[in-house]
UniProtKB/Swiss-Prot annotation:
An example molecular function term from Gene Ontology annotations: mismatched DNA binding
Keywords from the UniProt entry: DNA damage, DNA repair
Pfam families: DNA_mis_repair, HATPase_c_3, MutL_C
SMART domains: DNA_mis_repair (SM01340), MutL_C (SM00853)
UniProt protein name: DNA mismatch repair protein MutL
Protein family (similarity comment): Belongs to the DNA mismatch repair MutL/HexB family.
Domain of life: Bacteria
GO terms classed as biological process: mismatch repair
Disulfide pairings: none
Length: 588
């Protein structure tokens, strides 16, 4: 008896659908692309329960006849191609004829469409047609998706929370708003209008989605033999802690390619500090035969015929555009050796699109990998005691009963004083970092009421997150309110901050926390993490002049809690006992 069996068609269809439809955001993506391919100039998207229970995409496109509606839900039915060679000359979003059939297989689907002559309503459940009836509708199509994955419980079980799914759908809609500014979009969550964007410019859409960016510039289109580069970028002053503000489109398709991000940031050169990632919406337009878009089920990746040239052109274009910012000055080498060096660096970084395997974590690259590692100076070496002095000097115990009456500060870096049984040396910067860190862990810090509140304009995704994280922010001393503005955007008004933060840092900390929580596939490290980073950076530095009371307070904190290392793991102090000193000088 044969062990290998041919799968039933029903199972095959469900497996195939799972390659295209992975979550509500992928459904919205496919349906909006269908609307755009139908020449729609107005599109409305609505979701409920994060899109898990209901998704609607409605447009004013060319619509479908009764016969086309019935054919459209069959797999591999399309109006875009008819022969194999057509795949390499694609100008539309869709071409494989999988979207509607895949969605129909895993949901309860209703399609209402009119080609301008007649209108019909088609009901499909789990891929099976229930009925089709005549109805009334203006030219265009409305697709309603109910109960996604109702017939695949295991798949439905692994959908994310409503908040996360809503956020991913919102980001998909925002990407379409950016790439199609000439199309009006209405986006509703439940029954609330989140975006109502009429036809406009790329600058208009960029300001709506990234209102925190106050200075940006359009890229002057660069035309080469194989492609054109255009888009919009932020000045180096406006950055995020991850690359979520960088969006790339190839022939108007959103794509994921880490080397595109790398090339984009290389264009900024030394204008960026480590860990800073600027904003940018980049459009790469190719002749269809110069790219392959048929290498990924959701068409999220492309294969370039000359990838090294693409990456180099992006970097050069960004450099040129940055000259528009009046404050920006950067020496751009025209030396051929520098260009050659850059080209080789790009080409050596795994330039194999066909071998690139997409993982969830790569959708939203996380830059918060090791907070304290970046703080450690490269020249630091652990303390090496003299040969006759014990290694236990790195684990000193201080007398807690009294504070020193006298001390000296060496090189504006070290506090030196006499303890009851020896000599103590403290690195006051490392000590202050640890003190601040302990206060954070114990929530022992004061709050500061701001005389002039801070106003932060935010896009819809961040506004939603701000609302969800209100209690978390209040726990750490923030007090704020959320306001919706007349243009549909919103802002957070911060009235109170924790005293361990500088007022100038508060807005950035707030945004960094939101960025941490917006990454749907990774557990956020949270507000403590970001606050610790900023607070440690605000600790007293080498060269700072400390008052007598400030030195006493540092010593008191170190003694009372017996703190030994800073948050980076470096020693805070060393102690030489009198007996060790006597031994070294051969007095005993």
């Amino acid at each position: 008896m044969s062990v290998i069996k041919k799968l039933p068609q029903e199972v095959v269809s469900k497996i195939a659908a799972g390659e295209v439809v992975i979550n509500p955001a992928s459904v919205v993506k496919e349906l909006v692309e269908n609307s755009l391919d139908a020449n729609a100039t107005s599109i409305e998207v609505q979701i409920r329960n994060g899109g898990k229970s209901y998704i609607k995409v409605s447009d004013n496109g060319i619509g479908m006849s009764r016969d086309d509606m019935l054919i459209a839900i069959d797999r591999f039915t399309t109006s875009k191609i008819s022969a194999l060679e057509d795949i390499y000359n694609i100008h539309s979003y869709g071409f494989r004829g999988e979207a509607l059939s895949s969605i129909a297989e895993v949901s309860r689907l209703i399609i209402t469409s009119s080609d301008g002559n007649n209108a019909h309503r088609l009901e499909v459940i789990g891929g099976k047609i229930i009925k089709i009836t005549e109805t009334h509708r203006e030219r265009g199509t409305t697709v309603e998706v109910y109960d996604l994955f109702f017939n695949i419980p295991a798949r439905r079980k692994f959908l994310s929370s409503e908040k996360v799914e809503t956020r991913m759908v919102t980001e998909i809609v925002e990407k379409f708003m950016l790439v199609q500014p000439s199309v009006s979009f209405v986006f509703k969550i439940e029954d609330e209008i989140v975006y109502n964007a009429s036809k406009g410019s790329l600058e208009d859409r960029f300001s709506i989605i990234f209102p925190e960016v106050k200075e940006f510039s359009l890229i002057e289109p660069l035309q080469s033999e194989i492609m054109q580069i255009s888009g919009i970028i932020s000045s180096p002053q406006y950055t995020r802690r991850n690359r979520s503000g960088q969006i790339f489109f190839v022939n108007k398709r959103f794509v994921i390619d880490n080397l595109l991000n790398l090339s984009f940031e290389r264009g900024y050169g030394e204008a960026l500090a480590q860990g800073e990632h600027p904003y940018g919406v980049i459009f790469l337009d190719f002749l269809p035969d110069k790219i392959d878009v048929n290498i990924h089920p959701q068409k999220l990746q492309v294969k370039f015929s000359d990838p090294q040239n693409v990456y180099n052109e992006i970097a050069r274009t960004i450099r040129t555009t940055l000259r528009k910012f009046s404050f920006f000055q950067m020496s751009i080498s025209k030396n051929s050796e520098e260009e050659e060096k850059y080209s080789s660096e790009i080409s050596n970084q795994n330039l194999k699109a066909e071998n690139y395997q997409h993982t969830d974590s790569e959708w939203y690259p996380n830059q918060f990998k090791n907070l304290y590692q970046k703080e450690t100076p490269q020249t630091y070496r652990p303390y090496e005691p003299l040969s006759s002095i014990s290694q236990n000097l790195l684990l000193p115990q201080l007398n807690e009963k009294s504070l020193p009456k006298e001390f000296i500060v060496l090189k504006d870096r070290y506090i030196v004083f006499e303890d009851l049984d020896g000599l103590v040396i403290i690195d006051f910067h490392a000590a202050h970092e640890r003190i601040i860190y302990e206060q954070l862990k114990e929530n022992k810090f004061e709050t500061v009421q701001l005389l002039i509140p801070l106003h932060i304009k935010l896009g819809k995704s961040f506004l939603q997150l701000s609302q969800q994280l209100t209690d978390e922010f209040k726990k750490y001393g923030f007090d704020f309110e959320i306001k919706t503005l007349e243009d549909g955007s919103g802002e957070v008004v911060i009235k109170q901050i924790p005293s361990i933060l500088k007022v100038t840092d508060a807005s950035n900390v707030f945004l960094e926390v939101l960025e941490e929580y917006r990454i749907p596939f990774e557990k956020p490290k949270g507000l403590t993490y970001v606050l610790a980073s900023k607070a440690c950076k605000s600790a007293v530095k080498t060269g700072d002049k400390l008052s007598h009371d400030e030195v006493q307070q540092i010593i008191k904190e170190i003694k009372s809690k017996n703190l030994l290392t800073c948050p980076h793991g470096r020693p805070i102090m060393m102690k030489l006992s009198f007996s060790q000193l006597d031994s070294f000088f051969e007095r005993i």
